[in-house]
């Protein structure tokens, strides 16, 4: 339900209508907007935008919180199983909501398979873990996923195959998965921004997948001369994803390409694309590599509270397995 935007300072019926048309239908959306974003709307000055944002933040009670309040907020985090008990264990129980989790690796390492499996598992209530006192069943009822495909690797038939082996109706999984093919970085960013529209239309989006995060940026911005522009744009995209995760309590997963690390004598010989921008914006970072046969190894190497660890899992016809 939308808020009464005329309660904001300097907002009359006409301005409220313009805000709604631009997608700003509630106080939280305005409170987390920037002055530059609001001034893109015709008739709104910088001064007026700043007043609206401050007013919305007051109404949303945004500001400092005690550690106890944040601990209570953490109890609203829910987790999604990966289908691998080892990988779930490394993650502390599963893929976390209110977080962005990155899986980087070379081609064929299994990144896209993890993304497909996550879409399937979202439709299995037994794979959703949460504190029933902090998270209502309605919060995770009829969950839906958004899959932004930048490399043309989404395969509905693979979803059907995984779902069949998991005892889930494949048609249900596909019905509850919105897929968008992004051919460039502008499309990719636009689709991510449009997810809020899907939510406002009544879709309970609980999983957002970007596969892959950096391929479009990497193709368009080549050479050192365009590196700064690329990183700024990528930073804005990551900010959008983090905002979605926080505001709507959803799981956000991204896959990432890697490049050679020529100065690496010890440790990983490859590094994820995106540099410090992605490194600071992603909550959990995994490096996935091939093992023997159908085995894969996922190494957690960055997390705010979990230790570095490795998990071995298999990719079979049935999907992700121990």
From Swiss-Prot:
Keywords: ATP-binding, DNA damage, DNA recombination, DNA-binding, Nucleotide-binding. Pfam families: HHH_5 (PF14520), Rad51 (PF08423). It comes from the Archaea. ATP binds at residues 105-112. GO terms for molecular function: ATP binding; ATP hydrolysis activity; ATP-dependent DNA damage sensor activity; damaged DNA binding; identical protein binding. One of its GO terms (biological process) is DNA recombination. The keyword Nucleus does not apply. InterPro entries: AAA+_ATPase (IPR003593), DNA_recomb/repair_Rad51_C (IPR013632), DNA_recomb/repair_RadA (IPR011938), DNA_recomb/repair_RecA-like (IPR016467), DNA_repair_Rad51/TF_NusA_a-hlx (IPR010995), Hlx-hairpin-Hlx_DNA-bd_motif (IPR003583), P-loop_NTPase (IPR027417), RecA_ATP-bd (IPR020588). NCBIfam families: PRK04301.1 (NF003301), recomb_radA (TIGR02236). Belongs to the eukaryotic RecA-like protein family. HAMAP family: RadA_arch. Involved in DNA repair and in homologous recombination. Binds and assemble on single-stranded DNA to form a nucleoprotein filament. Hydrolyzes ATP in a ssDNA-dependent manner and promotes DNA strand exchange between homologous DNA molecules. This is DNA repair and recombination protein RadA.
């Amino acid at each position: 339900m939308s808020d009464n935007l005329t309660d904001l300072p300097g907002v009359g019926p006409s301005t409220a209508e313009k805000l709604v048309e631009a997608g700003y239908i509630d106080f939280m959306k305005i409170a987390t907007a920037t002055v530059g974003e609001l001034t893109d709307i015709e008739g709104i000055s910088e001064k007026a935008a700043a007043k609206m944002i401050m007013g919305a933040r007051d109404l949303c009670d945004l500001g400092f919180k005690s550690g106890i309040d944040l601990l209570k907020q953490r109890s609203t985090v829910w987790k999604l199983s990966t289908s691998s008990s080892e990988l779930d264990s490394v993650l502390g129980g599963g893929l976390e909501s209110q977080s962005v989790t990155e899986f980087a690796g070379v081609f064929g390492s299994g990144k896209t398979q993890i993304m497909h499996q996550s879409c399937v598992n979202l439709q299995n209530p037994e794979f959703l873990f949460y504190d029933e006192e902090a998270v209502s069943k309605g919060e995770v009822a009829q969950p839906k996923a958004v899959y932004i495909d930048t490399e043309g690797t989404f395969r509905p038939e693979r979803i059907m195959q995984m779902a069949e082996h998991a005892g889930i109706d494949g048609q249900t999984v596909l019905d509850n998965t919105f897929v968008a093919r992004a051919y460039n970085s502008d499309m990719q960013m636009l689709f991510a921004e449009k997810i809020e529209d899907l939510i406002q239309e009544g879709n309970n989006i609980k999983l957002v997948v970007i596969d892959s995060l950096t391929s479009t940026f990497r193709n368009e911005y080549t050479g050192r001369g365009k590196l700064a522009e690329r990183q700024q744009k990528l930073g804005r995209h990551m900010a959008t994803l983090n905002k979605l995760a926080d505001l709507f309590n959803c799981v956000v997963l991204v896959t990432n390409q890697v490049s050679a690390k020529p100065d690496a004598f010890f440790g990983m010989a490859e590094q994820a694309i995106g540099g410090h921008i992605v490194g600071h914006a992603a909550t959990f970072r995994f490096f996935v590599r091939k093992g023997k046969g159908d085995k894969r190894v996922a190494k957690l190497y960055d997390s705010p509270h979990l230790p570095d660890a490795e998990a071995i899992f298999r990719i079979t016809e049935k999907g992700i397995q121990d």
